[in-house]
């Protein structure tokens, strides 16, 4: 499967996320859903935020030009929200899966889909 297939067939087809991307730790976007304009700098800040949570607690999580309020996270998960739109990101060994979801999708639904793909990528060495 190509990276675009993972975005289209695993994330978007689930209907549990409304926009999604997979990128490298260097910020380069490998694949993204149609109309999802996330920048290399935004991805790089998300990746840095996994290591240094204070970057996100003070500056929020910016995706496609919109700043979301950081809610919680770990060394491999980031959760954020702004209004009716939520963010769920997962870091793997070489990649980061970034997703947006909108109500009525529940945070747990998006988390399940994103983390299932993330765990699979980890088992594949990514």
Curated annotation (Swiss-Prot):
Keywords: Actin-binding, Cytoplasm, Cytoskeleton. Its main location: cytoplasm. Pfam families: Profilin. One of its GO terms (molecular function) is actin monomer binding. It is found in: Cytoplasm, Cytoskeleton. It comes from the Eukaryota. One of its GO terms (cellular component) is cell cortex. InterPro entries: PFN, PFN_euk, PFN_sf, Profilin_CS. The keyword Cytoplasm applies. GO terms for biological process: regulation of cellular component organization. Gene3D superfamilies: Dynein light chain 2a, cytoplasmic. Belongs to the profilin family. Binds to actin and affects the structure of the cytoskeleton. At high concentrations, profilin prevents the polymerization of actin, whereas it enhances it at low concentrations. By binding to PIP2, it inhibits the formation of IP3 and DG. Occurs in many kinds of cells as a complex with monomeric actin in a 1:1 ratio. This is Profilin.
